[in-house]
Structure formats: structure tokens, C-alpha cells
């Protein structure tokens, strides 16, 4: 699970007005949709100036996060994003929402992340894409959790090929004439 938040959006809205905030958000959401499509990650829901995403493969989630971070530099300038990633089981609740420990952890990690930061628990790293580096981070004490969580910050650029959720299907015969 991935949670993304635009840092400073409330202050930006207060200083620049609703119209400017709406334009920035529309720009960022368009970029987010593109990156999700290119990496095979699904946007589960929009959360105002953020979103929750679901990925089957952790490498796809990491590719998504780092690519979105890069593209958000211009899409939501002068603001930045912060990201939390967590893996685990969850319940699909009433057909359109996910609940569970992994979901809560990803949301709390996003809240704790600094601008331009992508964080993940150390014990949940499964298989990072080539080119991605895990940098030690101080343990985090998160709201609702009894113990500090050991996390790392992910940085770098995935050099292995990202999956495209539609290109693989629609560019092959019999769909191409």
C-alpha cells in the first residue's frame, strides 16, 4: 500500500486561493494517473491533496513512488510530496475500501515522512528495483503504534523496466492492425 500527500497544500491554498490550488491539484492528479498507469499501480482513492494506491508487486510500488516524486517536482511546484509504503494483508471492505494494519501503517508513514521522502519499514523490504537505494532513517514513533518502527528512506532511480498496465495488452495482435 502507498499513501502520498502533497506537503504544504493547505498553506498554499490559504496564500494563493482556491483556484490556484485547484489548478495545482489537477496538474498533480494527471501526473499521478500517468505514473500509476505506466507502473501497473492502481489508485484506490483520492484523499484531497493525496491518494492511496495499491500494488501487487512491491517493486512496482517503489517505481511508482520514485517516478511520481521526480515528476511532481514540476507538476505541483512549488510544493513537494511525501510518501509512505507498507506491505501486508488487508480487507477489501464494502467493495471499495481497504482496511487493516498495513493500510494504517502506510498512512502513518506518509504522515511522518518529510518533503521529498519515501519511507518504508526495514522489515518489509522484499525486492527493490535495480538502481534504488535504501538509506538508514531514525526509528519512527507513529500515532497508534506502541513501538518505534525501523524505517529507511528510498532514493535513486529504478533502472529496470517498469510495467505498463495497458501497453502490454493492446499493442499485440489481434488488437493492432
Language model feature labels by segment:
Residues 1-63:
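Catalytic NTP-binding/metal-coordinating core of nucleotidyl cyclase/transferase enzymes
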Residues 5, 144, 173:
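Short, conserved phosphate/pyrophosphate- and ester-handling motifs at nucleotide-, phospho-/glycolipid
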Residues 11, 15, 40, 88-89, ...:
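Generic signal for short, ordered secondary-structure residues
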Residues 24, 36, 47, 66, ...:
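Residue-level detector of alpha-helical recognition elements and their boundaries
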Residues 26-29, 38, 110, 138, ...:
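Juxtamembrane helix-loop transition sites at the ends of transmembrane segments
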Residues 45-48, 110-113, 168-170:
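Short glycine-enriched loop/turn motifs at secondary-structure junctions
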Residues 52-161:
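Catalytic beta-strand-to-alpha-helix segment of the class III nucleotidyl cyclase homology domain
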Residues 153-177:
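Intrinsically disordered or compositionally simple regulatory linkers and C-terminal tails
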Amino acid at each position: 500500500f502507498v499513501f502520498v500527500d502533497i506537503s504544504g497544500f493547505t498553506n498554499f491554498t490559504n496564500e494563493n486561493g482556491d483556484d490556484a490550488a485547484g489548478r495545482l491539484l489537477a496538474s498533480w492528479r494527471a501526473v499521478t494517473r500517468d505514473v500509476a498507469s505506466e507502473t501497473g499501480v492502481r489508485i484506490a482513492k483520492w484523499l484531497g491533496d493525496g491518494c492511496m494506491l495499491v500494488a501487487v508487486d512491491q517493486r512496482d510500488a517503489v517505481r511508482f513512488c520514485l517516478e511520481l516524486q521526480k515528476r511532481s517536482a514540476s507538476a505541483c511546484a512549488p510544493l513537494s510530496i511525501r510518501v509512505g509504503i507498507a506491505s501486508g494483508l488487508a480487507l477489501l471492505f464494502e467493495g471499495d475500501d481497504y482496511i487493516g494494519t498495513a493500510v494504517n501503517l502506510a498512512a502513518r508513514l506518509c504522515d511522518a515522512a518529510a518533503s521529498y521522502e519515501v519511507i518504508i519499514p526495514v522489515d518489509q523490504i522484499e525486492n527493490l528495483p535495480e538502481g534504488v537505494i535504501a538509506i538508514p532513517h531514525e526509528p519512527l514513533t507513529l500515532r497508534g503504534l506502541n513501538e518505534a518502527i525501523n524505517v529507511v528512506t528510498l532514493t535513486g532511480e529504478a533502472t529496470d523496466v517498469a510495467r505498463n498496465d495497458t501497453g502490454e495488452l493492446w499493442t499485440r495482435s489481434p488488437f493492432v492492425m
